[in-house]
Amino acid sequence: ENFNDPKNIFNTLMEYKKILLNENHKMNLIGKSTIDDFDQRHIIDCIQIIKHMPDKKKQVMDIGTGAGLPGVLLSILGYQNLHLVEKSPKKSAFLETCKAHLGLNYKIHTKPIAEISGVNIDYITARAFAPIEKIITATKKIIHKKTIYVLLKGKSYLSELNLINPQKYSWKNYPSITSEESKIIVLGIK
């Protein structure tokens, strides 16, 4: 399938949305209050990170994928070496359903992030998962000197960044296009 064709991408995104909303009542993948504003709150919010991840061939890991946000969306947008980490077997089964129905290509890890090793990840993404410091600690076994964290963060981002050692890490925060109090934190190892 041609993931560079905007019409194909759009149709696949809408098909994903349909699957997610259909399954949502069974396992609460997204908050009910966010359903009416799904495209803005979830799709646009997640895909705004791709400008910080220009190389779609690199190894990408989305931790705490849950409903597939942003992991499944990154796959729809053509990222080729994706690892989705979701310790809940129910949610992993949902990610498997999306993969099969939408013809996507990603590896699902149904275990806590700290238990994963043997991969060298270039980009790490997370949305509504854990404080930045916990994400860094949990991913120690899978990173290298050039790994970049691209994290979608809410209003607590500043207090989270205050706990990060500026001698070891450098970061920039970018405004979110979907929420004034949210940021995209792009963090690298010094």
Could you tell me what each predicted segment is?
Residues N2-K56, M61, K90-L104:
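Class I SAM-dependent transferase core
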Residues A126-E133, K140:
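Alpha-helical transmembrane segments of helical membrane proteins, especially in multi-pass transport
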Residues K146-Y157:
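Conserved beta-strand signature within the Rossmann-like core of class I S-adenosyl-L-methionine
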Residues I136-I148:
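A short glycine-rich, Lys/Arg-flanked "PGG" loop and its adjoining helix->strand segment in the class I
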Residues K91-A93, I132, Y157:
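Short alpha-helix immediately C-terminal to the canonical SAM-binding loop
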Residues H83, S156-K190:
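Active-site capping/gating segments
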Residues N81, N105-K107, I148, Q167-S170:
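Conserved beta-strand segments of alpha/beta enzyme cores
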Residues I47-D122, A126:
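Conserved SAM/SAH cofactor-binding pocket of Class I
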